[in-house]
Amino acid sequence: MSKLLSYTARIILRNSRTTVRQLGQEGVRGFAGFVSGQRNAPQPAYGRPVPGLLRQKMVSSIGKRSMFIQTQDTPNPDSLKFLPGVEVLGKGNTYDFPSGTAAHCSPLAKLLFRVEGVRAVFFGSDFITISKEESAEWSLIKPEVFAVIMDFFASGLPILHEARPNADTEILDDDDETVMMIKELLDTRIRPTVQEDGGDIVFISYENGVVKLKMQGSCSSCPSSIVTLKNGVQNMLQFYIPEVESVEQVFDDVDRMADKEFERFEKNLKQKEPAGAPVGIGGGPN
């Protein structure tokens, strides 16, 4: 009797093990089928697999837009320095575009002037300085400038079609010793410092002890440009070149137009002020 019970127990145990094993295998197969079904099932719109061609286009687009562009403030609140992380014009070279009409020799400058609010463009060795209209907001301009710079460098087009940067300080056959020394100092001592602030100084002429220079980039409309010119540039030139008596800033037609507009704005502002209004430290009403 005990042997029969033992034999019956072994059969029941064997059958139960088989059942558990089968259930386990079926469970695994069922789970695998569920996962497979989920993979093949239609996905919601936000999670749908990207078609092959579209995926290739996206990868290509991401590759083109992998440039990391940094920005750097300048002494001029209306000018911002963009550093794309690649060479722009090369070491020591600069090119100024005070207006859109001057951008005929640069495809990149033309595109940047299409951004609403951009007033001037300046290329340096490894940076691009954008000067905006006073009423424009950087929060609106910066994203568009980023996109233009990234797309342009991905295209492989030349930055300049013609004209040589820094032709103003090239030593000419008819330059006398004083002019040669002025150009040398500008290139080696003065320009590198000014270019760090997103601007440049261009040599115009030297006559009767007077050096005439033009400010470009962020320096062209910077409130402290006159101080920089007199206290910095003039002092250095006079220290090394005794023949230099003074330094004067030269303005082009675009600069003169901007100054006239500012003077007109100030005049209109004063006319709108009530008579006898108290004047504050800055010259405006308290």
From Swiss-Prot:
Main location group: mitochondrion
Region spans: Disordered: 267-286
Record's GO cellular component terms: mitochondrion
Binding residues annotated for [4Fe-4S] cluster, in chain numbering: C219, C222
SUPFAM superfamilies from the UniProt entry: Fe-S cluster assembly (FSCA) domain-like, Hypothetical protein SAV1430
One biological process term in Gene Ontology: iron-sulfur cluster assembly
Protein's name according to its UniProt entry: NFU1 iron-sulfur cluster scaffold homolog, mitochondrial
Species of the source: Drosophila pseudoobscura pseudoobscura
